[in-house]
Curated annotation (Swiss-Prot):
Keywords: DNA-binding, Transcription, Transcription regulation. Essential for virus function. Residues 1-91 form the HTH arsR-type domain. The keyword Cell membrane does not apply. It holds the Pfam family HTH_24. This is Uncharacterized HTH-type transcriptional regulator B-115. The keyword tRNA-binding does not apply. It comes from the Viruses. InterPro entries: ArsR-like_HTH, HTH_ArsR_DNA-bd_dom, WH-like_DNA-bd_sf, WH_DNA-bd_sf. GO terms for molecular function: DNA binding; DNA-binding transcription factor activity.
Length: 115
């Protein structure tokens, strides 16, 4: 079984966002991805290289500009999506909902009550 920590989960979620952005536009430059996601160019480049090594995207240069495009391998993208679905429930649900607020929060301390 694969173990995940908070950083690896965030990295996978970020790579999924990058993949979605590229898929919506078919081809994007690394600098445009950086600007769109408000990330440093170095961070985007590191994640693009990982996605390239894993076979999700293809990187190529035109002049001094680095571009990324989605490879035609829907199976690997489906595997990534299924892995991330497991994290959805963990990160998407608030710790306490309005109805689950502990009753102690609503009570006044005996020292603050006057009467």
């Amino acid at each position: 079984m694969t173990e995940y920590n908070a950083n690896s989960i965030r990295a996978k979620i970020l790579r999924r966002k990058i993949l979605q952005l590229i898929a919506e536009n078919y081809v994007l430059s690394a600098s445009l991805i950086s600007h769109t996601l408000l990330l440093s160019y170095a961070t985007v480049l590191r994640h693009l290289r990982i996605l390239n090594d894993e076979g999700y995207i293809e990187l190529y240069k035109q002049g001094r500009t680095l571009y990324a495009k989605i490879r035609d391998n829907a199976k690997q993208i489906q595997i990534l999506n299924s892995e991330l679905e497991g994290f959805k429930n963990v990160s998407g649900k608030p710790i306490l909902t309005k109805d689950e607020t502990p009753k102690e929060f609503g009570k006044k301390d005996s020292l603050t009550q006057r009467g």
